[in-house]
Amino acid sequence: MRTLCSLLLICCLLFSYTTPAVGDLKHLILKAQLARCYKFGGFCYNSMCPPHTKFIGNCHPDHLHCCINMKELEGST
């Protein structure tokens, strides 16, 4: 019985642990999304984009919106 409990504990610890590589990958994705937003002249906004702007993507997985001013969008075309 003691062996079974020990084995169960080890399995729980192994499957619940997030590796540092996963954290690093998430950080790189966040950085890439933020850089892409700024590259196109956008800015990050916490809620829906204001009326004079357009939604062009996400800044982070935390549901921040990447918005761009309509004047900048018209000037680039």
From Swiss-Prot:
Signal peptide: 1-23
Biological processes per GO annotation: defense response to bacterium
Keywords for the protein's UniProt record, in alphabetical order: Antibiotic, Antimicrobial, Defensin, Disulfide bond, Secreted, Signal
One GO CC annotation: extracellular region
Compartments reported by the entry: Secreted
Tissue-level expression: Expressed in both adult and neonate brain, and very weakly in kidneys, epididymis, and testis.
Superkingdom field: Eukaryota
Main localisation: secreted
SUPFAM superfamilies: Defensin-like
S-S bridge residues: C37-C66, C44-C59, C49-C67
Function: Has antibacterial activity.
Assigned protein family: Belongs to the beta-defensin family.
Protein name stated in the entry: Beta-defensin 11
Species this chain originates from: Mus musculus
